[in-house]
Curated annotation (Swiss-Prot):
Family, per entry: Belongs to the class-I aminoacyl-tRNA synthetase family.
GO biological process per UniProt: cysteinyl-tRNA aminoacylation
Listed PANTHER family: CYSTEINE--TRNA LIGASE, CYSTEINYL-TRNA SYNTHETASE
Name of this chain's protein: Cysteine--tRNA ligase
Record GO cellular component, one term: cytosol
EC number annotated for this UniProt entry: 6.1.1.16
Keyword Signal part of the UniProt annotation: no
Record keyword Cytoplasm present: yes
UniProt GO molecular function: ATP binding; cysteine-tRNA ligase activity; zinc ion binding
Compartments it resides in: Cytoplasm
Motif position, 'KMSKS' region: 264-268
Gene3D superfamilies: Cysteine-tRNA ligase, C-terminal anti-codon recognition domain (1.20.120.1910), HUPs (3.40.50.620)
Amino acid sequence: MTIRLHDTNARQIRDFVPLTAGCVSIYLCGATVQAAPHIGHIRSGLNFDIMRRWFAYRGYDVTFIRNVTDIDDKIIAKSAEQGRPWWSIGYENERAFNDGYDALGCLPPTYEPRATGHIPEMIEMMRGLIERGHAYEADGNVYFDVRSLPGYLTLSNQELDDLRQPSGEGETGKRDQRDFAMWKATKPGEPSWETPWGRGRPGWHLECSAMAHKYLGSAFDIHGGGIDLIFPHHENEIAQATAYGDEFAKYWVHNGWVTMSGEKMSKSLGNSVLVSEMVKHWRPIVLRYYLGTPHYRSMIEYSEEALREAESAFARIEGFVQRVTEKTGEVVPPADEVPPAFAEAMDEDLGVPQALAIIHTTVRQGNSALAADDKEAAADRLAEVRAMLGVLGLDPLDPHWAGEGDRGEDLHGVVDTLVRLVLDQRQSARARKDWAAADAIRDQLNQSGLVIEDSPAGPRWTLGPR
């Protein structure tokens, strides 16, 4: 079946037809590194990580670009406020973003270009736009002439005459107040670069148009980002690129927000939950399940209750994986192919919720096989489950998650040793038929969040839901 994606520009789900057979090129607007990431930022990267994994499973050669905006007004303002170099703020937060992506199991991009490393490409694009009559210089600034492009605002489905001047775009010398800055003239104390029009720094929109052109050429398959980027950022990217002569992106794919009390999670609103704090209290694989299993276009309302539900749901999957592994005495490899129903769900606009239902159904079938002592059927179901989980980046037996890193593996070993000591005491109580003492030990372990299961091979423990 053909992969189908919701194209924001077409306002419908379309068949994906690559520009080059067997290849897919994706540009994702990545981090603006003025602060450490919250889970809303990481959700976007995670959604597109699932997309690239599915394309790879379907046999595509994937080129995935995720940029870093390492210079903008907020970074400069924070630099002045903290008395630190602008670049040190950017590098520190870029590392925090990459730590967050890695913690939640996102594969590294093919390239992750920084805006400040591509000033020559931006200058070349501005020169071309000025020559074509789509841009002009005024007082050291370079503006895009929005009235020069008839198709402007098609992506966001707006009318130019209804458009208000964007906030923060009150620079002098504009022909039309709706024209947007591609290059901002230098100001005292701000970083700047030399151009034919004087020293200055790039505007946000120019950066992505220039970097997408450099790494993916004049035409590429998919441009992605959060829905808040549709206007003005993506609209202005399209304007610059198409006026420059590029075909630019064939499909526009946007993910929903993480919200809190109905409002978008945002640094500026002060309602953000940092990834670095979340991973102290929740297993990263549970966070990935929580953020990655709703449909990418839906909103996720943040709550502790929803996280606990995700934790419980994943525990059922993980428990099945552990039980079959113990029963068979070996690590069952993933199947070569996912079940057809799972593939059908993923092909239809990355229908992860529907695909997840197939996983849970397969887990139930596997548990029934275990109950019937049918090891072969249980192993077959586990192979299917692992194949499906692998596509979603959620296979608990994947090396990335096995022990959840060295620190997690060490901690698990310490906890296992301590629990085994307590379980030995329980076994001794059972051996002398002191059932009250044995039950009391089990109850205390349960109250600590551990689930104890008695099996012919002896007691085993797992983490229970919170």
